[in-house]
């Protein structure tokens, strides 16, 4: 994973994350046993697509150089939970989704912190808040699964 030296690098990476999230939630929705959870996951696909569109719009408008570079090591700490194995059961997938949303929220917080452009800072803070809300949903779903197992 390369270091980020430009706004374009950051936005392109964030767009790829949102695309991966869409695929992740599409696949996870097929594993959901509860129809309301499957519907929520489908809604998340739509939300992640909206994030992608917002980021793409900014990418088309921006191309500035960052005052501070963001290292690949810093970013890689937040990006690990994207691929869903076909053998993953629903409980494991929900746990993975919690981790993914935590990672995305933290990544967007880091990106917001290094932005000198207020529009980009606000965009990444909003994305961070939304990803953290998604994490709360998955925490509740994971708890529900664990309680139903006992």
Predicted ranges, named:
Residues 1-150:
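Non-heme di-metal
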